Amino acid sequence: MNPQRRRRLWLVLALVLAGGLATTLVAMALQRNVAYLYTPSEVLRGDAGAHSRFRLGGMVEKGSFKRASGSLEAQFRVTDGDAQLSVSYDRILPDLFREGQAVVATGRMQHGIFVAEDVLAKHDETYMPKEVADKMGSAHRKHDVPAAAGQVGERQ
């Protein structure tokens, strides 16, 4: 093999290795930033990793909201109809946040409490994120909730 071909071969090998390394790094970064959606039942069953970041979806349980006096820290429970999970949040809650409404919170579990970094409330009375609607719909079917109460996830 002459020297020019050998240099080209090394260049091609270096480019292939650099491309593979870049692809691996991008895939690892994306995997770390992905936050899967779980319901309280799935979290308590252990489906979400013990220290992983994930989204918690469900309804804010009526009568569960408490705010610490003189602080932004709020405590509430999210339910999917089967289980409830306590949530702690120390930032300003969305204007549409209220008990009995759908919510999606992003955060991690710490000592049996979901510590939220971000909380999203549904934005009108008929819409619910599709992932939450699907999971809540299966809970409704399990508990024989009438179809009208389970029709969420689409605009009318």
Swiss-Prot record:
UniProt membrane topology term: Single-pass type II membrane protein
Principal subcellular localization: membrane
Residues binding heme: 123, 127
Cell compartments where the protein resides: Cell inner membrane
GO process annotations (BP): cytochrome complex assembly
Transmembrane region(s): 9-29
Superkingdom, natural source: Bacteria
GO cellular component: plasma membrane
MF annotations from Gene Ontology: heme binding; metal ion binding
Segments in the Cytoplasmic topological domain: 1-8
Gene3D superfamilies assigned: Nucleic acid-binding proteins (2.40.50.140)
InterPro entries, per database record: CcmE, CcmE-like_sf, NA-bd_OB-fold
Region described as Disordered: spans on this chain: 136-156
Annotated HAMAP family: CcmE
Described function: Heme chaperone required for the biogenesis of c-type cytochromes. Transiently binds heme delivered by CcmC and transfers the heme to apo-cytochromes in a process facilitated by CcmF and CcmH.
Family under the similarity heading: Belongs to the CcmE/CycJ family.
Record's protein name: Cytochrome c-type biogenesis protein CcmE 2
Organism of this sequence: Xanthomonas axonopodis pv. citri (strain 306)
Gene: ccmE2
